[in-house]
Amino acid sequence: MSLALPSEGGCQCGEIRYRLTGEPVWLAVCHCNDCKMQSGGVFGMSLRMREADVKLISGEPKCWTRPSENGGRAKNCYFCGTCGIRLWHTGGLGFLSIKPGTLDDSSLLAPRYEGWTKRKVPWLTIDGLEVSHYTQPGTAARG
């Protein structure tokens, strides 16, 4: 996984812009229902970043707080109030999960992990993954 630094991204209408100044921790694909719904697709993706390495350049995102599907801690979800694009959500403990599709250039990124494979659509294959989790990473049930 590689990302030219600094990298910038933002929402679809351009009202909100951000800059990434540090290396990503990881990029993951998630097949949980929450990620499917927020992405509008059959999976979601999250680029884990240290909160200190994410700088807001312009605009002010709106925030919606939702409970976690697996009963874990609630997540604060940040999005553009004008175009509605989800930009990131809190990952806990000083981390943010950036939606990589909001980056100006995500062409060098490739996921290494996937979670919630028990909810993965059967026709999807993602090459190059190092780790797959049957449910939530960190739980006993792994696939």
Go through each PLM region and give its residues.
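A short Gly-Trp-Pro
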Residues: 1-143
